[in-house]
């Protein structure tokens, strides 16, 4: 589980366009900090031997973990709530990268398993469906509220509610 002694350990704070790196030696002391764009980030790892990369398990982390693993680099994804406890000063990208290195040393923090593309796709479908269901319920409840303002009570349940609202709107005798 330890990185190869001669190879550096890198804490990476991921962002949309700029990534912050904290590079540590074999004794986990930060010896260098770098701020890289996405293209520079890719070039940096392709052209360098690294023993371990530590990232927060957040958006795009699984993509980068798979990419780095394909290069033969060991990757650890740490749960975000546990990493926050290791930020020593104001929350900045540089402080987060250093906090990742500190958190990686803690044996109590269990790393997140890197998801395959298929696992991520299934998770995205489930989340999209949940979001759609939540917004559907919200829209139906809003329509129920509007109907109540006209003295029309709509039965509970999404299917029944939608059918009833449709009938009320189509009825020329309704107040709406």
Language-model region placement:
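A detector of single, family-specific signature residues
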Residues: 1-176
């Amino acid at each position: 589980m330890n990185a190869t002694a001669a190879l550096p350990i890198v804490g990476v704070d991921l962002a949309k366009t700029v990534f912050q790196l904290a590079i540590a030696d074999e004794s986990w002391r930060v010896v260098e900090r770098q701020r890289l764009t996405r293209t520079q980030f890719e070039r940096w790892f392709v052209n360098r031997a690294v023993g371990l990369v530590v990232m927060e398990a957040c958006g795009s982390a699984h993509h980068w973990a798979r990419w780095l693993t394909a290069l033969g680099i060991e990757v650890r994804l740490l749960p975000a709530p546990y990493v926050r406890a290791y930020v020593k000063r104001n929350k900045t990208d540089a402080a987060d990268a250093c906090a990742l290195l500190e958190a990686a040393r803690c044996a109590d923090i269990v790393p997140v398993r890197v998801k395959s593309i298929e696992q991520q796709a299934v998770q995205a479908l489930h989340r999209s469906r949940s979001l759609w269901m939540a917004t559907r319920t919200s829209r139906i409840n809003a329509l129920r509220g509007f109907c109540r303002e006209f003295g029309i009570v709509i039965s509970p349940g999404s299917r029944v509610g939608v059918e009833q609202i449709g009938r009320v709107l189509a009825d020329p005798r309704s107040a709406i």
